[in-house]
Amino acid sequence: MKEYKLSEILTIKNGRDYKNLKNGLYPVYGSGGLMCTVDNYLYERPSVLLPRKGTLSNIQFADSPFWTVDTLYYTEIDNHLADPYYLYYYLKQLDLTQLNSGTGVPSMTFDSYYNIKVNLPNIHEQRAVGQFLSVLDDKIQLNKRINDNLRASRAQSQTQFELCRGAAVNADVSPNLLTLDRSSTKVKVRRAA
């Protein structure tokens, strides 16, 4: 393990206004998360996105071209010293609220970030851990999408059930609907009309 200040392993850059850009494929991130997509990007390499204003605990990661607004810094990381994904997870577990420099809205300055000390293993270990965590994150995202699809499917099935239940209540007007004959001790299936 070796101790570094963040200033030794990365450069912090300011986000910019995106309002003059058109809709497109590149995500725009703010301190609250994904905002929209635009037709241009600020940076194309993997980057840890650090909140400047707002929710200081919402450290994000971008691994494809992106744009950030002025409430979010992006980082240019020295890949010889730090694996971006490993560094993302390392910083994510820190409590940054103690470094808050704002009086009203929580805020962080370049210097607040640059003075953070991190203990990093050698780059090969970082890459192995970073890759493992990346695979886990991908699996978690896949599971979330599966759960969302299951919820949507359940809601659709529930709607269909409600429609069928309504048809069963009105079986006398639906001659092709099968119903139960409960007039005797044995239950028989009969046509509705």
Report each predicted region and the residues it spans.
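A short beta-sheet element
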Residues: G30-T97, S101-V105, T109-Y113
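Non-catalytic DNA-recognition/assembly elements of restriction-modification systems
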Residues: M1-G30, N115-A193
